[in-house]
Amino acid sequence: MEFSTQSSASLHQIKTSALAIGVFTNQVLTPAADIIDRASNGAIRKVLKSEFSAKSGSHLVLRNLEGIKAERIVLVGLGDQDKYQAAQHKTAESTFAHYCIQAKLSEAVSTLAGVDCNGTTLRQRSSGAAQAVLAASYRFDATLSTKAEAIKLSKYLQWVPRTLVSESKAGLDEGTAIGKGVNFTRLLADLPPNICTPTYLAEQAKQLGKTYP
């Protein structure tokens, strides 16, 4: 999985399979959602009024919006703006990642880390984003006769203003390292005890030491 930033184009001009924008309950738009709404002649506000409550963990896919180059706009519910914290942000990123995986997309762009939330920095939110995506992509098939279908999602871009690229990139790098570590731990935990023996764990530890000296 490749994580990187996108800052070279206006949101409505980004060509991507899916662009995630966050919206709060009570029809409150994030700055990114407002940009897309203006570029699409109010399409986002119309949907919020009629069919999307924006509860945390929910999403709605809009296709072929006028004035928008992204194939899909994925509205991601953030819940109540006053209660939006790191946990809700991670849920939002996970919701979008699961959608992209289920839709078998190869790449996607998210604006979710750019949404301010209480007690966090952009770096922390970027780290949380990478962790959420890697967690969503975890599959265990090491001991199964039928292997899990390969995840097609290989590139996850985070849209941020140019002035914030370095902070975002640092967070993505941090989150990638943590996410890979968590997934490796999950793999070990999922292995049967006749395979994941103390000797096997010691061998894995030695290999990690060689890979990450």
How should each PLM-predicted stretch be described?
Residues 1-213:
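Short amphipathic alpha-helical segment within the helicase RecA-like ATPase core
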